[in-house]
Amino acid sequence: MNQKPPPYGYGGAGGGGVGPSSTSNTTIIGTLSARAKQTTQSMITTLRPWREILDLSALSLPRGYDEAMAHLKHNISYFRGNYALAVLAIVFLGLIYHPMSMIAFIVVFIGWILLYFSRDANDSIVISGKEVDDKIVLVLLSLVTVLALVYTDVGENVLVSLIIGLLIVGAHGAFRNTDDLFLDEESARRGGLVSAGSGNRPPSSYTPI
């Protein structure tokens, strides 16, 4: 009499079969690890030498509002990695007397990086074979962030630290002279300093004599 084969993912006593859930978990962990490595490498490549930020001789008073905004836009594109680390450092300093809150903040921050900011348009999250919409991911991450701030009772500390960090970044960006800061074409386009089609502009034609 023929026996029915065991269900998929369940081996015999010596089969050592691996269930689909185990394979799925391994795939998710591998994807997150690769994404974390790629994000870290990308952030490192955007960092500029800190001596360029701390160069006091490069600070000057802008001649007007338009020049200050031009400086700010250029410096944010150039120092974006350094500015992000500076703001995070200020937030961490605001939580230095709240170690549990700092741990919660780090976990939430890593979640935002891995599950939202480091993903491109074609990189979707799949759970149990179903694709999760980006709006759901955004809502869930926002909810977790709010709950973390409420239950750790440091929402005011984080808000004040963020405001201080953004004010420092804004002041530095507006007063830092940009004459010695040269952006590559991709960074300039991302910062809105050049039009999207300027890099693909064909060379001007000429008539040989």
UniProtKB/Swiss-Prot annotation:
Region ranges (Disordered)? 1-20
- Keyword flag Transport: yes
Under the heading InterPro entries, the entry gives:
Prenylated_rab_accept_PRA1 (IPR004895)
UniProt entry tagged with the keyword Translocase: no
Indicate the transmembrane segments per the record.
90-110, 132-152, 155-175
Tissues where this protein is expressed: Expressed in hypocotyls, roots, lateral roots, columella cells, leaves and shoot apex.
A GO biological-process term: vesicle-mediated transport
What is the membrane topology noted in the UniProt record heading this document? Multi-pass membrane protein
Give residue spans, biased composition: Gly residues: 9-19
| Top-rank taxon | Eukaryota
Alphabetically ordered keywords of this record: Endosome, Membrane, Transmembrane, Transmembrane helix, Transport
Q: Where in the cell is it found?
A: Endosome membrane
Any one GO CC term of this protein is:
endosome membrane
Q: What is its main location?
A: membrane
Q: What does this protein do?
A: May be involved in both secretory and endocytic intracellular trafficking in the endosomal/prevacuolar compartments.
Q: Which PANTHER family match?
A: PRA1 FAMILY PROTEIN E, PRENYLATED RAB ACCEPTOR 1-RELATED
State how it assembles. Interacts with PRA1B1, PRA1B2, PRA1B3, PRA1B4, PRA1B5 and PRA1B6.
Record family assignment: Belongs to the PRA1 family.
Q: What name has this protein been given in UniProt?
A: PRA1 family protein E
Q: Which species does the entry assign this protein to?
A: Arabidopsis thaliana (Mouse-ear cress)
What is the gene called? PRA1E
